[in-house]
């Protein structure tokens, strides 16, 4: 998270996990005691994934039982970059499921959101990853039910500022008003489309895909609370 800081509220940190596998590092958010929501591109490669839940000084390491990417996801399209990760064992007691937002309409330009992830603080420097950071960003451009672009409220995407980066993918996006889960971090780029951090942060809003999330969670044996 470029320009991010440790989350001011510990309750936010208790929802979030670090996902590692092969040479990959991503973020995820618990939505049930043994189920994590993340970005599909984080878990597409063959390999063994593990989740690290941080409670106290030592992380609890959890094995992954199965992964369910959204069936329409493709790295070459704007299809939903979402996946569910089923844990082989329940997570640490300190990890709590996040509550979904009940918001059913796309955000408006200027709406504020909290993004969080374990990604790098400096693009290209993997040594700066692995620490949970958060930032407050605002909606810009044309918010829709498929994609949401967030920017630093001071820079507005015109120059580098706060924003998600490598390793933040799959991390949660919370409504700044009620702290409810409204989206998942998917990508970052400059306004010209170049993959540069600190300009535009791309988000997948969850309202459109809520039915898929609920149905898939039940198939994985982790029904979500109403």
Residue ranges and their predicted role:
Residues 1-22, 27:
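N-terminal activation segment of mature serine protease catalytic domains
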Residues 8-12, 30-31, 44, 61, ...:
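Extracellular/periplasmic catalytic domains that process cell-envelope and extracellular macromolecules
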Residues 19-21, 30, 38, 53, ...:
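Hydrophobic residues in beta-strands and at strand termini
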Residues 19-21, 156-157, 162-166:
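Short loop/turn motifs at secondary-structure junctions and domain boundaries
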Residues 20-21, 38-41, 46, 71, ...:
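Sec/Tat-exported extracytoplasmic proteins
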Residues 25, 30-43, 134-139, 169, ...:
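C-terminal subregion of chymotrypsin/trypsin-like serine protease catalytic domains
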Residues 25, 32-33, 37-76, 108, ...:
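Catalytic-histidine neighborhood of serine endopeptidases
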Residues 67, 79-161, 199-200, 206-213:
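Chymotrypsin/trypsin-fold serine protease catalytic domain
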């Amino acid at each position: 998270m470029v320009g991010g800081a440790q989350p001011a509220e510990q309750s936010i940190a208790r929802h979030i996990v670090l996902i590692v596998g092969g040479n990959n590092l991503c973020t995820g958010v618990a939505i049930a005691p043994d189920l994590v929501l993340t970005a599909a591109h984080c878990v597409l490669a063959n390999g063994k994934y593990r989740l690290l839940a941080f409670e106290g000084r030592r992380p609890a390491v959890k094995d992954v039982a199965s992964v369910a990417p959204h069936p329409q996801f493709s790295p070459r399209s704007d299809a939903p970059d979402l996946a569910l990760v089923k844990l082989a064992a329940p997570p640490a007691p300190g990890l709590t499921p996040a509550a979904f937002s009940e918001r059913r309409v796309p955000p408006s330009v200027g709406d504020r959101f909290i993004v969080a992830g374990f990604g790098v603080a400096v693009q290209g420097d993997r040594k700066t990853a692995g620490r949970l950071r958060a930032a407050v960003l605002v909606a810009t451009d044309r918010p829709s039910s498929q994609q949401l672009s967030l920017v630093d409220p001071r820079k507005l995407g015109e120059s580098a500022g706060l924003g998600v980066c490598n390793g933040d993918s799959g991390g949660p996006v919370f409504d700044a008003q009620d702290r409810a889960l409204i989206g998942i971090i998917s990508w970052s780029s400059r306004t010209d489309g170049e993959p540069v951090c600190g300009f535009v942060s791309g988000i997948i809003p969850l309202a459109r895909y809520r039915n898929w999330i609920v149905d898939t969670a039940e198939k994985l044996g982790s029904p979500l609370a109403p």
